């Protein structure tokens, strides 16, 4: 069935699970909190701050062949938040980026990618000029399952952050504690941009 482009644009970042999971060629299997993850030594931990947390988006990126399983681990990252980037994605959504914000504890996921999976993710993230690939270190991050993490790779916006009068705008769909700024849904942020660019429309 062909995907409705308007629905895709308006529903970013798409449904995000509440627990860690294995993504395997479009199928997801929950990882129990007491389950031990193995085989991560040769994988790269990449923090997902927007739609890469959602199996729906992972299914769009990893299709057409057998990509193998991807462990996707729920975390709580301290002193950062998921906020909007000031650009429009090719599919019409206002996407996310990571911003340092003291006192915020944001629920995000880490994708553990093997070499082939990482190459594919690069193709979907850094083929344009909107995101760069980097490393965050010295983090305070709690993991639901798997080994402790002190550093993680990330695709972060090269455009900065989308701000209103109070600062960067958090994603309402991404759970967080300690926010002092009003978060907006995808529809709300699109309306905000419309009103800024074309008041009274």
Describe each region flagged by the PLM.
Residues 1-201:
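Glycine-aromatic micro-motifs
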């Amino acid at each position: 069935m062909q995907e409705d482009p308007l629905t895709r644009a308006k529903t970013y970042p798409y449904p995000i699970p509440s627990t860690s999971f294995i993504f395997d060629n479009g199928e997801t299997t929950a990882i129990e909190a007491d389950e031990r993850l193995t085989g991560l030594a040769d994988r790269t931990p990449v923090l997902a701050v927007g739609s890469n947390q959602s199996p729906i988006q992972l299914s769009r990126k990893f299709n057409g062949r057998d990509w193998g399983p991807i462990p996707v681990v729920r975390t709580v990252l301290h002193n950062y938040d998921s906020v909007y980037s000031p650009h429009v994605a090719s599919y019409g959504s206002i996407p996310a980026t990571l911003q340092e914000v003291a006192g915020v504890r944001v629920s995000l996921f880490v994708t553990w990618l093997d070499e082939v999976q990482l190459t594919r993710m690069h193709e979907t993230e850094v083929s344009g000029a909107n995101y760069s690939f980097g490393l965050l270190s010295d983090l305070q991050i709690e993991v639901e399952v798997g080994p402790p993490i002190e550093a993680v790779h990330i695709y972060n916006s090269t455009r900065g952050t989308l701000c209103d009068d109070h600062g960067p705008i958090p994603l309402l769909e991404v759970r967080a504690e300690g926010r002092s700024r009003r978060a907006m849904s995808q529809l709300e942020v699109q309306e905000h941009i419309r009103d800024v660019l074309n008041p009274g429309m």
